[in-house]
Amino acid sequence: MHSRLATARLYLCTDARRERGDLADFADAALAGGVDIIQLRDKGSAGEQRFGPLEARDELAACEILADAAARHAAMFAVNDRADIARAARADVLHLGQRDLPVDVARAITGPATLIGQSTHDRDQVSAAAIGAVDYFCVGPCWPTPTKPGRTAPGLDLVRFAADVAGAKPWFAIGGIDGLRLPEVLAAGARRIVVVRAITAADDPREAAAKLKSELLAAI
C-alpha cells in the first residue's frame, strides 16, 4: 500500500452526490481519468443541505460504491475523519484533521493495513507531520475554498515550506486547486494535489481528471 501511495499524484474528495444520484457513474469516470485516491467527504455538501447529514448506514453504502470503483481502477479509497467507518468499509486510507482522533488511536481502530493521512495548516503542523507517524499529509488551503468556510488560507508559502522539509514522505497540496492554478502549485514545489470542484463540478469528470493527471506526471 505504501508503494501505491508513493506513486499517487491526484487525490479527489467527493460528496455522496445524493442530489444527483450518480455517485457510481461519477466515480468510474473520475477514476478512469486518472484519479489515484478517491475520498468520501459529505460535510457541507449540497446533499447535506438538502437531505441532512449522511447517516452511518448511508455513509457505508456510499463507501462501498467508491471502494468497488477504486478496486476496478487499481486506485485507493479513503474515508474522512471516521476511523470506525474506515474499518467497517475496509478503506485503504483514513484522513484525519488536526482535531480528530490522535493517529495512534485511529490506527488501533483501523488496523495496521490502513494508511493514515493528516491535514496541516501551518509550519509547525507541517514539520510535525513530516517526521510523525502519519503516512502522508496535506498542506493548505492554497486558496480559500467553500468546502472549508472561514478557514484562512496559508497559501503557496506553506507549500514551498513543505517542499523544503517533507523529505521522502508523500504530501499533497490542497485548497482551491484547479487546472488554471495548478502551474502555480507545481512551481511552488508540490507534485501531488487534492481537488474537489475541479472534478466534481466538471461537465466531463474523466476529461478533467485526465488533464490534471497529465500535468502532474509531466512535472515529475
Curated annotation (Swiss-Prot):
GO cellular component: cytoplasm
Keyword Metal-binding: yes
One Pfam family from the record: TMP-TENI
Signal peptide limits: none
Keywords recorded for this protein, A-Z: Magnesium, Metal-binding, Thiamine biosynthesis, Transferase
Catalytic reaction annotation: 2-[(2R,5Z)-2-carboxy-4-methylthiazol-5(2H)-ylidene]ethyl phosphate + 4-amino-2-methyl-5-(diphosphooxymethyl)pyrimidine + 2 H(+) = thiamine phosphate + CO2 + diphosphate; 2-(2-carboxy-4-methylthiazol-5-yl)ethyl phosphate + 4-amino-2-methyl-5-(diphosphooxymethyl)pyrimidine + 2 H(+) = thiamine phosphate + CO2 + diphosphate; 4-methyl-5-(2-phosphooxyethyl)-thiazole + 4-amino-2-methyl-5-(diphosphooxymethyl)pyrimidine + H(+) = thiamine phosphate + diphosphate
Residues noted as binding 2-[(2R,5Z)-2-carboxy-4-methylthiazol-5(2H)-ylidene]ethyl phosphate in the record, renumbered to the chain: 145-147, 176
Annotated cofactor note: Binds 1 Mg(2+) ion per subunit.
Listed pathway(s): Cofactor biosynthesis; thiamine diphosphate biosynthesis; thiamine phosphate from 4-amino-2-methyl-5-diphosphomethylpyrimidine and 4-methyl-5-(2-phosphoethyl)-thiazole: step 1/1
GO MF term set: magnesium ion binding; thiamine-phosphate diphosphorylase activity
Entry binding sites for 4-amino-2-methyl-5-(diphosphooxymethyl)pyrimidine: 39-43, 80, 119, 148
Entry's Gene Ontology BP terms: thiamine biosynthetic process; thiamine diphosphate biosynthetic process
EC number: 2.5.1.3
Enzyme class: transferase
Matches recorded under InterPro entries: Aldolase_TIM, ThiamineP_synth_sf, ThiamineP_synth_TenI, TMP_synthase
Annotated binding of Mg(2+), by residue: 81, 100
Cofactor(s) required for function per UniProt: Mg(2+)
HAMAP family: TMP_synthase
Task of the protein: Condenses 4-methyl-5-(beta-hydroxyethyl)thiazole monophosphate (THZ-P) and 2-methyl-4-amino-5-hydroxymethyl pyrimidine pyrophosphate (HMP-PP) to form thiamine monophosphate (TMP).
Family of the protein in this entry: Belongs to the thiamine-phosphate synthase family.
UniProt-recorded name of the protein: Thiamine-phosphate synthase
Organism per entry: Mycobacterium ulcerans (strain Agy99)
Lineage: Bacteria, Bacillati, Actinomycetota, Actinomycetes, Mycobacteriales
Gene: thiE
